[in-house]
Amino acid sequence: MSIIVNLDVVMAKRKISAGELAEKVGITPANLSILKNNKAKAVRFSTLEEICQVLECQPGDILQYIPDK
């Protein structure tokens, strides 16, 4: 099973840079990069909530579940 983070897609639609998003969410650009590049092992609900507020989206717009074949 894989969880894919489609943050780049939503960021592009909202025309927001990684630096701007990190600042508004209150996380470091390095941590945002880890999340964007699907390297994160976990994400706090509070961080996900902030990202959704800033990007005006739902968690399902950012996260995608890919089942194992």
What positions do the PLM features span?
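A short, Lys/Arg-rich alpha-helix, primarily the initiator
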Residues: 1-16
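Residues within the helices of the helix-turn-helix
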Residues: 8, 19, 49
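The alpha-helix within a helix-turn-helix
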Residues: 11, 22, 52
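Residue-level detection of the helix-turn-helix DNA-binding "recognition helix"
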Residues: 12, 26, 37, 67
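Short alpha-helical DNA-recognition segment
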Residues: 16-34
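Short, basic-rich loop-to-helix N-cap that marks the start of a DNA-contacting helix
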Residues: 39-50
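Short C-terminal boundary/hinge segments that cap the last helix of small helical domains
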Residues: 56-69
